[in-house]
Amino acid sequence: MQPEPRPSGAGAHTQFLPLRSQRPEGAGDTVMYASTECKAEVTPSQHGNRTFSYTLEDHTKQAFGIMNELRLSQQLCDVTLQVKYEDAPAAQFMAHKVVLASSSPVFKAMFTNGLREQGMEVVSIEGIHPKVMERLIEFAYTASISMGEKCVLHVMNGAVMYQIDSVVRACSDFLVQQLDPSNAIGIANFAEQIGCAELHQRAREYIYMHFGEVAKQEEFFNLSHCQLVTLISRDDLNVRCESEVFHACINWVKYDCEQRRFYVQALLRAVRCHSLTPHFLQMQLQKCEILQSDSRCKDYLVKIFQELTLHKPTQVMPCRAPKVGRLIYTAGGYFRQSLSYLEAYNPSDGTWLRLADLQVPRSGLAGCVVGGLLYAVGGRNNSPDGNTDSSALDCYNPMTNQWSPCAPMSVPRNRIGVGVIDGHIYAVGGSHGCIHHNSVERYEPERDEWHLVAPMLTRRIGVGVAVLNRLLYAVGGFDGTNRLNSAECYYPERNEWRMITPMNTIRSGAGVCVLHNCIYAAGGYDGQDQLNSVERYDVETETWTFVAPMKHRRSALGITVHQGRIYVLGGYDGHTFLDSVECYDPDTDTWSEVTRMTSGRSGVGVAVTMEPCRKQIDQQNCTC
């Protein structure tokens, strides 16, 4: 007989007890089982003590699957839920308390905290539809839920009642994806009623962002006057012009004029009426029947019309600032030759986007925004083949990332200045060859037409232009002989120019903008040097005062205002085409260098508008 093999290691041995057939006391049949007595001895390995671990990954799923089978076959269930909801037929659902308690804090409290339901086998449930309860019970066992679109609100409401947060989040995410102008208000109201803050916030943001479309829907006309006033009072309402808000309010009143005409005055005070154009106000005062029958509202709008046409500085509500990304756009420019670049800078994260190029390279152009669209006006194409002054007006749509040509100006204008009043673009001065213009023309986007208006009192190229209180200011420049410190102001109602207090410094090619009811003139060229000095014009006192200088001297710079700060971009310092970007904080009277452009350049057109549609950019980049 062969000896039994011994385990490796000195003195090591293992004994296993075989399965024994025993007859437990009181048992009629033989039962095979292993003895609980273990006399085995295992010698540790040479590597020291080790731990054996094993996990069955799908055990939980399998276990809950078996429990669900037991539920469906009504085995081992220890509770019956008797669900009654309004006029719906009552229904009974058998389940296991431990499973319900594991998925719902409400059921857990019901079955474990000494409540009367803890010892009950039949529990009455009210306030939830049986079909909703059926789905929530099924979710407790399967971690899966499915329903038709029309049932989502009911299931979400039930999940909120029983604090099943995962189902609440899933329903909320689904409803966010379904947001539409026709249902956004209803979803927002529902979310508010059930206390789902995240869904309520997302729905409200959708309403603010798509106000123009939402205001055409039935849900909008069913708002209470308090809800409507709250909505149109939002600073972040996304509208192309304030007339959208005005028309929405008038249409809401007309929906039930007999009951709602008493709310017109409250609504008008929530509309940013000082952002409406005098022409628009005049037309409404003449033609709107609701205003005709309300003398107080009519007088209120007449007062605003007078303030606008008299160009009075007024303490009014701030302009709308929708929570959509607003970027600083730079078009064209010059570095050795004219450029066709269109780029956008995001001050919030410091990134640059390369967008659709201008159709023709240009420098010395100007940029402005009307109705969210970016316009590139005039300039010159300096190229190795020759120089061509431009009369072109091109329009860029951020939503499509495409340029489209508009009607050209009456004459080419290089080193032009532009401003916008009442949605109309004013092209000021500039040059065509050796001709230095004092002419000014106005573009009406809705008609795609240019019309000459009164010429300036002085010929100006490299002129800085700004608009404040519906007045157009032309600052500095070059008249063909002298660089200028003079400035003048255009009154659109009178169609005339008037001289104002001259600057402290001669400046041609300065950057001019408006911030906090003051006009700023930054940098420029005085005939000898590029400048870094900055001065500010107070229209109340009619005086220019110096503020902190820029860190770099620069002329032919780009300038704009973004979120209450001035940004200057590029330019020429007398030796180098600059790529630096500086930012001015009026609260601290300090400049800081915030970023660099992708390359140095001067003579760019700059303006601020909405972030472009990334989908369009990605698609067009893929086709290149």
Swiss-Prot record:
> Which biological processes are named by the entry's GO terms?
cellular response to interleukin-4; cellular response to oxidative stress; in utero embryonic development; negative regulation of response to oxidative stress; negative regulation of transcription by RNA polymerase II; proteasome-mediated ubiquitin-dependent protein catabolic process; protein ubiquitination; regulation of autophagy
CC terms in the record's Gene Ontology section: actin filament; centriolar satellite; Cul3-RING ubiquitin ligase complex; cytoplasm; cytosol; endoplasmic reticulum; inclusion body; midbody
Output the superkingdom of the source species: Eukaryota
Keywords assigned: Cytoplasm, Kelch repeat, Nucleus, Repeat, S-nitrosylation, Thioether bond, Ubl conjugation, Ubl conjugation pathway
Where it sits in the cell: the answer is: Cytoplasm; Nucleus
Post-translation changes:
Non-enzymatic covalent modifications of reactive cysteines by electrophile metabolites inactivate the BCR(KEAP1) complex. Accumulation of fumarate promotes the formation of cysteine S-succination (S-(2-succinyl)cysteine), leading to inactivate the BCR(KEAP1) complex and promote NFE2L2/NRF2 nuclear accumulation and activation. Nitric oxide-dependent 8-Nitro-cGMP formation promotes cysteine guanylation (S-cGMP-cysteine), leading to NFE2L2/NRF2 nuclear accumulation and activation.
Give the function comment from the record.
Answer: Substrate-specific adapter of a BCR (BTB-CUL3-RBX1) E3 ubiquitin ligase complex that regulates the response to oxidative stress by targeting NFE2L2/NRF2 for ubiquitination. KEAP1 acts as a key sensor of oxidative and electrophilic stress: in normal conditions, the BCR(KEAP1) complex mediates ubiquitination and degradation of NFE2L2/NRF2, a transcription factor regulating expression of many cytoprotective genes.
What is this protein called in UniProt? Kelch-like ECH-associated protein 1
Q: Enter cross-link residues for N5-[4-(S-L-cysteinyl)-5-methyl-1H-imidazol-2-yl]-L-ornithine (Arg-Cys) (interchain with C-151 in KEAP1).
A: 135
Q: Which residues form the signal peptide?
A: none
**Stretches for region Disordered:** 1-27
> Domain notes, please?
The Kelch repeats mediate interaction with NFE2L2/NRF2, BPTF and PGAM5.
Show the GO MF annotations.
disordered domain specific binding; identical protein binding; RNA polymerase II-specific DNA-binding transcription factor binding; transcription regulator inhibitor activity; ubiquitin-like ligase-substrate adaptor activity
Assembly: Component of the BCR(KEAP1) E3 ubiquitin ligase complex, at least composed of 2 molecules of CUL3, 2 molecules of KEAP1, and RBX1. Interacts with NFE2L2/NRF2; the interaction is direct. Forms a ternary complex with NFE2L2/NRF2 and PGAM5. Interacts with (phosphorylated) SQSTM1/p62; the interaction is direct and inactivates the BCR(KEAP1) complex by sequestering it in inclusion bodies, promoting its degradation. Interacts with NFE2L1. Interacts with BPTF and PTMA. Interacts with MAP1LC3B. Interacts indirectly with ENC1. Interacts with SESN1 and SESN2. Interacts with HSP90AA1 and HSP90AB1.
Modulation of this protein's activity: Ubiquitin ligase activity of the BCR(KEAP1) complex is inhibited by oxidative stress and electrophile metabolites such as sulforaphane. Electrophile metabolites react with reactive cysteine residues in KEAP1 and trigger non-enzymatic covalent modifications of these cysteine residues, leading to inactivate the ubiquitin ligase activity of the BCR(KEAP1) complex. Selective autophagy also inactivates the BCR(KEAP1) complex via interaction between KEAP1 and SQSTM1/p62, which sequesters the complex in inclusion bodies and promotes its degradation.
Location of the BACK domain: 184-286
Matching entries from InterPro entries are given as:
BACK (IPR011705), BTB-kelch_protein (IPR017096), BTB/POZ_dom (IPR000210), KEAP1_BACK (IPR047098), KEAP1_BTB_POZ_dom (IPR030563), Kelch-typ_b-propeller (IPR015915), Kelch_1 (IPR006652), SKP1/BTB/POZ_sf (IPR011333)
S-(2-succinyl)cysteine-modified residues are where? 38, 151, 241, 288, 319, 613
S-cGMP-cysteine found at: 434
Highest classification ranks of the organism: Eukaryota, Metazoa, Chordata, Craniata, Vertebrata
Member of which family?
Belongs to the KEAP1 family.
* Residue ranges of every copy of the BTB domain listed in the record: 77-149
Keyword Ubl conjugation carried by entry: yes
Per the UniProt record, the site (Sensor for electrophilic agents) maps to 151, 257, 273, 288, 434
